Amino acid sequence: MVPIDMMSGENKTEEYLAKNPLGRMPLLELDDGTCIAESIAICRYLENEIPDPPLFGTTSLEKAMIEMWQRRMEFQFLNPMIDIFRNTHEMWKDRIVQIPQAAEIASEGVKEQMVGLDQELEEKEYIAGGGYSVADITAQCAFVMGKAAVGIRIPENLSNLSDWWSRVTSRPTARA
């Protein structure tokens, strides 16, 4: 694993752009030089190479439910957190036209979605039901980004969501 410092623009170097012309992260470079970009594409590749534990499910129903929840976590949390970050963080001020109102709208939407997810987690330990899955990973990444980049935190009164957060962040892989 080679860490890339996005804050200093390492992902915009000629060397990195040769591997991923969009300059985005993450990027998985295989031993043969093949480069795979985009989180879910990388996760699917790794799942096929190392299928245990199955993060995308094993039955048709599990796969569909996990995919459904993964997409919801992407649309309801990850994408809005990215929008908030891009429209408020100093790092982006000379890279894009920042629209503070877009960040405010996204932030309000995230808060509303947290209430809904808290209710959803009332009857289950993990987002897609069953065990830990890529849906949990997507949500976890969104909340890590939200907390680190723009200070968004899970409110304490959302006890189901807070309990879920404690479960996923206490996993050994969360500390790796």
Question: Where are each of the predicted segments found?
Answer:
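GST-like fold's C-terminal all-alpha helical module
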Residues: 70-170
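GST-like domain detector, emphasizing the conserved glutathione-binding G-site
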Residues: 1-104
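Short beta-strand(s) of the beta-wing in winged-helix/HTH DNA-binding folds
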Residues: 26-29, 127, 175
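Charged/polar, low-hydrophobicity segments characteristic of intrinsically disordered regions
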Residues: 170-176
